[in-house]
Amino acid sequence: MWFKNLTLYRFNKPFSVDTEALETALADFTFSPCSSQDISKFGFSKALGKKGSALVHSAENRHLICVTKEEKILPGQVIKEALDEKVAEIEELENRKVTKKEKDTIKDEITTTLLPRAFSRRSQTHALILPEIEMILVDSSSATKAEELLALLRKALGSLPVIPLSFTTPIEQTLTQWLQAGESPLPFAMQDEAELKSDSDEGGIVRFKQQVLQEDEVLAHIATGKSVHKLALHFAQSIAFLMQSDASVKRLKFSEEFRANNDEVSGEDPLARLDADFALMGSELIAFVQALTQALGPMEESI
């Protein structure tokens, strides 16, 4: 339930799909497990997991969705060894070289043979659709996984006019200014971790952890042409996170004190607690994203 990373996108046009219509659209692309010959499967699953019953969990016009991906694990080395063995056998028996086209066919046959016996792994990715601030927040540290989710959502809805979050001033420039000034705009507070990169392609990377970032040792790297590409921050008293220069948010962590706001919700009804946590998280993420976009400056106009 509690998001751990954020890849952020904003709508070019208002999102006006209600819960019922969204549920209906996603239902045509639900997840089903891999069959014996499937390499991978991808689809929407229950937003609240086994305790839920719907693909979309909504409250106050905030929509939580989830995709599940199952992938068969076929180690490349296993396939290579089987391929090499088969090719060597053919070349010895027929006294000729096996062509690339033949190798590709043999490789496909080996994969088909191994698939039914292969182990599989599953992963889930959640996203929060927030029409009130015209954004989608994907709980993933991987831009690829975020784009996969959005691609399936776009397919289900027919269109999805969103673009990655970006700003007129490069984020690394803004983070560098904060570090040089020794403070970030309220309600954000700098912590003790940063990563600096040289502005030149040949330059280096330096990482600081558990260190006062206003010390001369850190500032000297900025003076020699490095910029801050990662910076640990706190938002108010509720969220710790690592801001990245690509506009993604990593290592998002809600404080125990903040999460304790729902401790009075009855533990006898797991769904009631999940619903309360969703409402609490959603409200705070909206406040967080609004403050973050304001602090990082004007967003780039969409094309």
Curated annotation (Swiss-Prot):
GO terms for cellular component: bacterial nucleoid; cytoplasm. It comes from the Bacteria. Disulfide bonds: none annotated. GO terms for biological process: DNA recombination; regulation of DNA recombination. Keywords: Cytoplasm, DNA recombination. The keyword Cytoplasm applies. It is found in: Cytoplasm, Nucleoid. Pfam families: RdgC. One of its GO terms (molecular function) is double-stranded DNA binding. Belongs to the RdgC family. May be involved in recombination. NCBIfam families: PRK00321.1-3, PRK00321.1-5. This is Recombination-associated protein RdgC. It comes from Shewanella denitrificans (strain OS217 / ATCC BAA-1090 / DSM 15013).
